[in-house]
Structures are given as structure tokens and as C-alpha cells.
A protein has these predicted regions:
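Terminal interaction-prone segments of large eukaryotic proteins
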Residues: 1-4, 8-15, 19, 23-333
Length: 333
């Protein structure tokens, strides 16, 4: 019966444990507390990658000192994407490796594909994480949230990827409801009227639509007659020439979009460059390239035409000192 009550990772992991860990770095015991200089460096790095995140991420990174005001999506973003980059070389090796145990485990449990293949492995990572957490931060911090981490893989085994059973959809829809209310009087009636006027089923947001025409190129010689656009919405996904929304996985290769073209036939193509060299981002606790997390260097000089239908996965790309690190985008908000 107890196992039938699922754990919500939004509250357990994001608003619970990750928030707790950051608080220990800032004002915890001396053995795990970071210096003010290190916190400032991490915070500045976080703010510097704001423009590199996809626009459908509703919140951009803020200073680590503002963690008490972060929303659940910000803690999730830190755990899965920005944290592994900005913490590298700033935490001790033991603390960073322990953070990566949690980050990699959650990446697996939040991906529908990886969850099916590596659910058992993610459970082992979480048990290892909790054991090492006690050694690094002290057993006095092994609270209920920390203990429950070891049971997340059991829920994923039963119900699939953890986003299937999280509170995030309800939290996101709450914002939609709030936008339907214009004044404090009779809020329920206002919501009912707005819903009756225009059913918010999301069809409009998923319609394919080319936006922001231009004529600046680059183009390809085998596309003689065409229109050029800076942005295209395809089945709810924003495809753009701008940093943050211009990197996609194409048959295992990372494509950087330079232009969007509509042929006379109506077919939509992107003009892309591909990264030519890639390596894994980290080797602990697993070769990260197995999860699609890679470092990329050296863009090709050649341009290629790629149909928008071939852009299978949107990527989160963050700058490194030499090159970029690529993460599969697991969420659209």
C-alpha cells in the first residue's frame, strides 16, 4: 500500500533536496561550505549562460545567493543542465562527483528512453549518492527527503519517466489559469467565461508556422527559389537561428542552424553546420556520451540543407572554455 503513493520529484528533489544542498554550500558546516569568492564565481557563471538556454525555459539562471527565491524549474535546470558546468572545478572532487551521481541519475529517470534501459542503474546511483552524502555533509542532514531519493527508481520502474507522475504540469497550468483572471472580483466566473470563449487545448501553439522573414542568408546553391526566415515553429518546438534555439540532434550529430528556408513547394529546410569533433563531458559515474551529454568542438566550414522533419531532438548547448557541452533537452518549460 505504501508503494502505491508515488513520490513527486518536483517537491522531493527540486524544491527539497537540491535546495538543501545549495543551502549547505552557502551556510552549512565548514567542511562543505564554499567560500564567498567561489559562490560569486559560480553565480556569475550562471548568469553568463542565460542567453544560451532555450526560450521555452520559462526562467533563466539567477545568482546562487538568490536560491531561496528560486522556483522548482530553476532547481531542475541547475541539477540537469547548468550545475554540472558551473560547478566543475569549483567544488572539491568528492563533492562534484557526488553531485554528478544525482544529476546523472535524474537525467536517466526523466528520459522516457533512458529510463527503460537504465532504471536499475539509476537506482544504484541514488543509493550511492545518499551514502556519500552522509559522509560529505554529515548524518544529521539525512532527512526524509534525502532518504526518499533511493525509492525514486522504484516509481520510475512502475510508472515510467518521473515526469509522468510529477506536479509540474499542474504547476504550469496554474499560471495559465491566473492569466485568465483580470480583476479580483469573481475569479471563478472569469475563468469559466474565458474557457468557454476559447478552449485552451494548445492546438494553436502546435501549428507549424514560419516567422520573421529576412533576406540575409546564408543559402545553398541548390535552393534557387525560396523564402528565408529566422524562426519556425514545428509541432510546438521553436526552431531558430538565434543562440539557445538553434542546436538539434540530427542522426546523432549536432547541427547548428544558420538559416531557415521555405521552398516554392512549401517544404521547410534549415541551413546548418555540424560539429566535427565530440567527446564525453564526464566519465564519472558513467561515460556521459551514453546519455547524449557530450563536449563539441570545431564547427564544419560547409553548410548543409536539412529538412525540419529531421531535427529529432532539441539540445541545450552551454559554452565551455574550449568548445561547448551538449545536453538533451528533457523538458519544454
Amino acid at each position: 500500500m505504501v508503494s502505491s503513493f508515488v513520490l513527486d520529484y518536483m517537491h522531493l528533489v527540486c524544491l527539497g533536496h537540491v535546495k538543501k544542498v545549495i543551502s549547505l554550500w552557502i551556510k552549512g558546516p565548514l567542511r562543505c561550505r564554499l567560500s564567498a569568492v567561489t559562490i560569486s564565481i559560480i553565480s556569475n557563471h550562471l548568469k553568463s549562460v542565460r542567453d544560451h538556454l532555450p526560450r521555452n525555459f520559462s526562467r533563466k539562471p539567477r545568482s546562487l545567493m538568490e536560491y531561496s527565491q528560486w522556483k522548482a524549474t530553476e532547481f531542475r535546470q541547475f541539477l540537469l543542465y547548468t550545475g554540472p558546468v558551473v560547478l566543475q572545478g569549483r567544488l572539491s572532487a568528492q563533492m562534484y562527483n557526488n553531485f554528478m551521481l544525482l544529476s546523472i541519475a535524474m537525467t536517466i529517470l526523466l528520459s522516457p528512453v533512458l529510463c527503460c534501459k537504465y532504471c536499475g542503474y539509476a537506482g544504484k546511483l541514488l543509493k550511492c549518492y545518499v551514502t556519500n552524502f552522509a559522509k560529505l555533509y554529515g548524518t544529521e542532514h539525512l532527512v526524509y527527503n534525502t532518504h526518499c531519493l533511493i525509492h525514486l527508481a522504484d516509481d520510475a520502474r512502475k510508472y515510467g519517466a518521473l515526469d509522468n507522475i510529477s506536479c509540474f504540469p499542474f504547476e504550469n497550468y496554474l499560471g495559465t489559469l491566473k492569466r485568465l483572471v483580470r480583476r479580483p472580483q469573481n475569479p471563478l466566473q472569469q475563468v469559466v467565461r474565458r474557457l468557454a470563449e476559447k478552449p485552451i487545448l494548445g492546438e494553436d501553439g502546435r501549428q507549424s508556422k514560419a516567422q520573421i522573414p529576412h533576406s540575409c542568408g546564408p543559402t545553398l546553391p541548390d535552393f534557387p527559389a525560396h523564402m528565408q526566415f529566422r524562426q519556425y515553429r514545428h509541432e510546438g518546438t521553436v526552431i531558430s537561428c538565434c543562440v539557445g534555439d538553434n542546436c538539434f540532434d540530427v542522426e546523432g550529430r549536432v547541427a547548428v542552424i544558420r538559416n531557415i528556408i521555405q521552398l516554392l513547394s512549401g517544404a521547410m529546410y534549415t541551413v546548418c553546420q555540424f560539429y566535427e569533433q565530440q567527446d564525453c563531458f564526464c566519465r564519472y559515474p558513467i561515460d556521459s556520451s551514453c546519455l547524449g551529454i557530450r563536449t563539441m568542438t570545431q564547427l564544419s566550414d560547409h553548410l548543409y540543407g536539412v529538412p525540419v522533419t529531421s531535427l529529432t531532438k532539441k539540445l541545450v548547448v552551454l559554452p565551455l572554455r574550449n568548445g561547448h557541452v551538449v545536453f538533451p533537452q528533457l523538458h519544454d518549460h
